């Protein structure tokens, strides 16, 4: 069984691109370019890709909702009074120990929302698994992930345009954490990665 590691090349890529000295890209171009780079990485295969060689055409190019900057919102981390271990269920039925860091409080589409942020052993960034009203229809039924780089201020940007599928979506050999009930959002999040079906339009 292979574990889906929480460190995400995708979020790191956005940070790296924003730090270069070339003329600044537009928000849409930056996200689109990172999506293209993820396709290239997965297509190369090897340890960088969860996709089996025989399944490349089934999953690539990855499918996304259209980029919508209104899904990128500020959030305030309310730290947990005591950091406790949470036994997070996984796609294989086992439990994985993660640390509950606190609650991200934000507003989206006029609705006040919150998501619990976790820390996985060996990682410094925040891990935010979530599901929403598109889960199981337009997006993967087991939810999606967002990774956040730590900040000194406790202010974060939750960008659902970079929400991505767990590796077990592509390959059942991977063991993936499942979003807890507290991270089920009662609205549709039509941003980020979605399922690629025969009749879906591939959007980058």
Protein language model features and the residues they cover:
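Bacterial signal peptide processing site
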Residues: 21-23
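Acidic, glycine-rich flexible loop segments
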Residues: 131-164
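Acidic/polar low-complexity flexible segments
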Residues: 175-202
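Bacterial N-terminal signal peptides that target proteins for export
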Residues: 1-10
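Beta-strand/loop-rich accessory regions of lumenal/periplasmic or secreted enzymes
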Residues: 160-169, 175
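C-terminal motif of bacterial Sec signal peptides marking the signal peptidase cleavage site
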Residues: 17-19
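Mid-length scaffold segments of soluble, non-membrane domains
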Residues: 79-142
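N-terminal secretory signal peptides
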Residues: 30, 35-103
